[in-house]
Structures are given as C-alpha cells and as structure tokens.
Amino acid sequence: TLDHLRHVAVQTNKEWAERLGVQQSTAITCVKPSGTVSQLVDSASGIHARHSQHYIRTVRGDNKDPITQFMADQGIPAEPCVMKPDTTMVFSFPIQSPKNAVTRNDMTAIEQLEMWLIYQRHWCEHKPSVTITVKDEEWMEVGAFVYKHFDEMSGVSFLPHSDHTYQQAPYQECTKEEYKELLKKLPKKIDWEKLSSYEQEDNTIGMQTLACSGDVCEIVDLT
C-alpha cells in the first residue's frame, strides 16, 4: 500500500510539474507532522508514539529573547536551566495524551525500529528521522538490529527509556496527579497583546542565514 501511494504521489507531482513548466520536486513523500508542528497541534510527532499517558514537556528559552521574559511574567512554570542557569530558562507544560493513544511504553525498541524501516523502504524518498527509546534490557537486541541493517541506518537516534538519565529532559513521564498539580500552576489566560511591549528591537538579525553557493550569496532587497 505504501509503495502504491508513493508511486501515485510521485507521478502526480511529475504530471503537474510538466503542466506548470517547472522542475519536478526532488522529494515528494515525507513523515508529518514535524516535531515543531506536533507541539502546536498536540499530536504525536511523525512516526513516534506518544511519550506516555501523562508527561511534562519542557521548552528552553534564551533569557535575551523577549518571549522568554513574557512567558515568565505571565506565570508559566519556569526554572533556570541546570546546564546554563545564567542564560537559559526552562518552561514546563503538562501534557495528557488522548485516550487509547499508543505510547512508547506500548512498543519495544525493535518494534519502533521496524516501523521506521518500513517507512524508509516503502514511503520516504529521503531518510526519515526517528528517536528510539531503549530499555536497559533491549540494548543488545538493538545493537544486533543496527548491525544487520547497517547499510540502511541513517537519521536514527537512541535514548534510554528512563527519564532519570537527563535533568530537565524535553519529555518527562509523570503521574496523573502530578499532571493535575502542574496544570493548576498554569495561568488561566495569557494576554498575548502584551507581547509587543517586550519586543522593542529586532532580535532575529543574528539568526538570519544567507543562501550561499561557493563564494556567492543570494541577497534579496525587499525595500
């Protein structure tokens, strides 16, 4: 089925590229939603399962970023980053997965890898990225899988299944009671109209990148 769907997608792109007189896209198929979009729409990311039924999602913010100060002033639970306490703030958001959602606790590391391999072989024209959570007793089996499929392994990261390995990890499993307690600490309403008062200067200049090839960079003057 995935092979057929990929073929239809590629052929449709080819047909419309010819009609419009443009080049055919290099890659058509991919896995969505992306990590960022999944946070905005409250869904699992790509081919990943949900972290757990209840978990805390931490987000880091640069202290120089206006939205970091804005969020702190609005009362969103925050604490200094343990690695960079002077420059970075860590915000915590309680998340509840939908009822009957598949979580990482429902899948073994090998099942996660096998799903990734199916989409790589039969759907994606590029290498889909995935983070595999591995229990202590699964590492040897995972190592054997990587060795067997070594020539296909790309875009795969591994993390210990335990949440206690890293402080302030991006995803931290919690109980239903802990979820409810943190939920009470969130502000009932965020006044986004006040954000503009924090943005008194352009902080994006340093983050801009130029499209460069060789010794030439493309700069478009929009003024």
Model-found features: residue ranges?
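Internal maturation/activation junctions in enzymes
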Residues: 1-32
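Catalytic alpha/beta core of large soluble enzyme barrels
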Residues: 6, 18, 33, 40-206
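Short capping micro-motif at the N-terminus of alpha-helices
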Residues: 26, 39-40
